[in-house]
C-alpha cells in the first residue's frame, strides 16, 4: 500500500497562488517539482453548505482513474500537512504550468468569441459546442474529441462541477505553442460529501445507490435550461463524436485494475474502499453496459 507523504516540511514556493472555491491551496516544492496542495474545506469556510471532507480523496482517486483509462489528467498523490495541532489530509497536484506555461481556462477562451451572445461562464451545451467550433486556440475537431472524452470520464466518476473555469489550455510563454491542459479539479467526483454513515446507507440500500446514479449528481452542462443527467444523456444520444469517445474509452475501463489501484490508496478505511469500488462499478454498468 502506498504511504502518505508528509508535506509539512516541504519548502513553500513564492509567487504561486491558486483560485477556486473548495478549500485552501498552497504551492510547495517536492521531489524537484512544484506541487499544489489542496486542503479540504472546513465547516467554518462553508457554513451553509455540505461538507466536502472527502474532496481530497476524490481528487486523487478520480485523477488517477482518468489516467488509467487513457484520458490525460494531472499527476496527484495523497499526503498530510500539519497545521497547528491538526494533521490535515491533502491532495498534492503537480503544477502543470511549471516550466513557463500559462493556463487559460475555457471561460477565458469563450470570451474571445465576440459574435456569441453569451458570456464565458455559460454552460449551455449547444453554446459550449458552438464556442469549441469558433475558438482559434486549437483545432476545433480535436477539441470536440477532447471535450467528449472529458464528458465520458466525468460521467463515470459522477462529476457535478465541470464548468468552464476548470478545463482549458496551456500556452508556452516562449514558443506560443498551445495544447489542451491535463484534466484537473476532480474534487466534486465520487460523492465527496458522503461521510461513512452515508456510504454505509448507500451500500446497504439499492434505492439509495440508484438515486445517486440516476437522479444525482448531474452534469453542470445544461440542455434546454436544465442540467444534463449523465445516464439519460449517454443512454439516449447517438451523437457521432460522443459515440467515438465511448467506443475509444470504455474498452480501456478495466474495473479490476481500478479496484487494485483503490486497494493501494493510503488513508482510506475499508468502508471507503468498498464504497468507491461499488459506486464506480454501478455507474459503469448503468452508463455503458446496457447501451
Per-segment meaning from a language model:
Residues 54-56, 142-146, 269, 273:
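Aromatic-acidic/polar surface patches that form glycan- and anion
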Residues 67, 172-291:
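C-terminal catalytic region of ATP-dependent kinase domains
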Residues 1-115:
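Conserved ATP-binding subdomain of kinase catalytic cores across diverse folds
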Residues 94-151, 259-266, 286:
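ATP-dependent phospho-/nucleotidyl transfer catalytic cores
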Residues 2, 9-11, 126-140, 195-198, ...:
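A short, terminal or domain-edge coil/loop segment
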Residues 126-195:
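Conserved kinase catalytic-core segment
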